Amino acid sequence: MRKFSDQKGLHYVLAFILTFGYALSVMATVANGQDFVTIKDAWVRPTNPGQEVGAAYMTFLSAQDATLIGVESDVTKSVEIHNMSMENGVMKMRMMEKLPLVAGKPYKLAPGGFHLMLFDLKKPLNIGDQVNFALTFKSKNKHEFKQNIKVMVQSPAEASTTK
């Protein structure tokens, strides 16, 4: 009789371990962003010597509703999400705290619209340079994850032909 209850207890422990392990693997997939947000057509505009501000552009495609809540880069002290819009014949630029992404809908950051502003550049950005970004997203389930990408500095003409 005792042997049966020991085996039954072992089954419960094993079931718990397997369930817990599966839950951790699902959380790890969300946490590292694998296949969660796809980033394509990314490029950074080159700057002139002495220029302290730059811009980056890319297209996001999220597998589920998510929000871009932060961006860091190795070439600048701060990165902000900005939007440009025409109001009463005047072009205005506004900082956005976050950028909502709708599942399955591409979201394009492009000149004249949404883009990433790179402030206090540490060095000029020359054509051919690589810029590292760490993008922080929050899923609809409130899971946060970072996605690291390397982006090439290109002229607008080059960027439009490499897509």
Residue ranges and their predicted role:
Residues 1-9:
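N-terminal secretory signal peptides that target proteins for export/translocation
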Residues 8, 16-18, 133:
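A general marker of short, structured functional hotspots
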Residues 12-25:
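Bacterial N-terminal signal peptides
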Residues 30-163:
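Compact, glycine-rich, soluble single-domain proteins
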